[in-house]
Amino acid sequence: MTKPQGIAVLGATGSVGCNTLDVVARHPERYRVVALTAHRQLDKLFEQARRFCPDYLVVADADAAARLRARLAEAGLRSEVLHGADALVQVAALPEVDAVMASIVGAAGLPSALAAARAGKRILLANKESLVVAGRLFMDAVRASGSALLPVDSEHSAIFQSLPADYAGNPDGAGVRKIILTASGGPFRNRPAADLAHVTPDEACRHPNWSMGRKISVDSATLMNKGLEVIEARWLFNVPPSRIEVAVHPQSVIHSMVQYRDGSVMAQLGSPDMRTPIACALAWPERIDAGVEPMDFFSLSDLTFEKPDLERFPCLQLAFDALEMGGDAPAVLNAANEVAVAAFLAGRLRFVDIPRVVAASLSGVSCAASDSLEGLLARDEEARRFAEGGVAAC
């Protein structure tokens, strides 16, 4: 019998992490959970530990680790508890780990994802910031180690499935004309521009189609999420920005498309359920049950497409601008956006000021290219400080 794959789920208590464990639980003969990590949600992590009995658990700090150890001991569970950023890097590169679900939100997920790449792991990439912040560095590590990189974002999974199996980062050789990323348009697609100044965090977090965490829900509402996905697609598929297009598709049935030179368009369709791309990445090239109901085509409404409104939602254009600027501009964009979104969720910044803080940061922070992880993290910190000043000035 084939030995089960060892899985580390980084960001286990978030939306993607929970969905990953839902899929894994359906296939105990295929997967063994080696490590689970969480930032704040200790209760949820404890329940996951009871169910999956991982070898390692990682939490943010020593206090959280001590509290978790006490609960595990009381329950008779033997998972080893580690803490801190170095522990995330450690479990991502463990010899007994075959695949790493990289689903920590934001730039905080970069060091552990990069460690998995350097260790030659099969990387299930949900942390798009790894490529936004460190695209060249990350892809160089993947190539050097022979790591397998499989996208988990529904759009990039759709592109991956719509490209030839031997694509190998060669769009011209594969006859690719362009990549078309679809976007739902978010909860404010039809909201008058004048009303956007009064948007509340709770409104921004109510996505019309997908169930997601609060940060990514706000990014979806501003279209920054789609902008980050454009940058991610550039690195994943080695396609220049001029050959990446965004189409607003409110029904979220077509998850993305590839247009070929001969006029053909290949698309991947499915219900808006993250378990589908997660299962695809976990088992590729095989297909496994994800617990997702089959799509009923006869119950679908019309499938419609619109151009994105870049005046009302300038974050998407800012992402294209950062790609064109090159260097560390995408890292600056991401850092400033994380600061601005956190301020918005905390009630310190208006929704319409998020792109203003990001634009000011792109203009005010040096975007000269860094050639190391340490340099990129220093640029990230510089951009965060600048953006905090921008938030205070709004």
UniProtKB/Swiss-Prot annotation:
The record's InterPro entries line, in alphabetical order, gives: DXP_reductoisomerase, DXP_reductoisomerase_C, DXP_reductoisomerase_N, DXPR_C, DXPR_C_sf, NAD(P)-bd_dom_sf
Q: What EC number(s) is this enzyme filed under?
A: 1.1.1.267
State which pathway it belongs to: Isoprenoid biosynthesis; isopentenyl diphosphate biosynthesis via DXP pathway; isopentenyl diphosphate from 1-deoxy-D-xylulose 5-phosphate: step 1/6
Enumerate the residues binding Mn(2+): D153, E155, E229
Q: Which reaction does it catalyse?
A: 2-C-methyl-D-erythritol 4-phosphate + NADP(+) = 1-deoxy-D-xylulose 5-phosphate + NADPH + H(+)
| Binding-site positions, NADPH | T13, G14, S15, V16, R40, Q41, N127, E129, G213
Q: What class of enzyme is it?
A: oxidoreductase
Q: What Gene3D superfamilies does the record point to?
A: 1.10.1740.10, NAD(P)-binding Rossmann-like Domain
Query: Is Manganese found in the keyword set?
Result: yes
Which UniProt keywords are present, listed alphabetically? Isoprene biosynthesis, Manganese, Metal-binding, NADP, Oxidoreductase
Q: What does this protein do?
A: Catalyzes the NADPH-dependent rearrangement and reduction of 1-deoxy-D-xylulose-5-phosphate (DXP) to 2-C-methyl-D-erythritol 4-phosphate (MEP).
State the family named in the UniProt similarity comment for this chain. Belongs to the DXR family.
Recorded protein name is 1-deoxy-D-xylulose 5-phosphate reductoisomerase
